[in-house]
């Protein structure tokens, strides 16, 4: 029978803790970027064309803010997937402890 267990209990627990922290942090960053927080302006990839465009410069900056926010939400979803995988590994390790050899 093929075992789906590929990491030990410590690594699985570490992956679970790190993924929970990553989801919380990236979700908060995504919220702050989509609400156009001024303190995060240094993390927005602005160019000179964005600041001096003929259209409306604030709209191009807001578009970049939203794009970075969406990227944070996508990364948070990836962390949810890794957390689910780590949770499954923790459960498989617990089940392995109770099996009689």
UniProtKB/Swiss-Prot annotation:
Its EC number is 3.1.-.-. It comes from the Eukaryota. PANTHER family: RIBONUCLEASE KAPPA. Keywords: Endonuclease, Hydrolase, Membrane, Nuclease, Transmembrane, Transmembrane helix. It is an enzyme of class 3 (hydrolase). It is a multi-pass membrane protein. This is Ribonuclease kappa-A. GO terms for cellular component: membrane. It comes from Danio rerio. Endoribonuclease which preferentially cleaves ApU and ApG phosphodiester bonds.
């Amino acid at each position: 029978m093929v075992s789906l267990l590929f990491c030990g209990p410590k690594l699985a627990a570490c992956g679970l803790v790190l993924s929970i922290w990553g989801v919380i942090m990236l979700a908060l960053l995504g919220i702050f970027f989509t609400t156009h927080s001024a303190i995060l302006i240094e993390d927005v990839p602005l160019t000179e064309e964005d600041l001096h465009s003929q259209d409306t410069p604030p709209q191009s900056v807001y578009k970049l803010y939203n794009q970075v926010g969406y990227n944070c939400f996508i990364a948070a979803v990836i962390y949810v997937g890794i957390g689910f995988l780590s949770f499954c590994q923790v459960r498989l390790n617990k089940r392995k402890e109770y099996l009689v050899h």
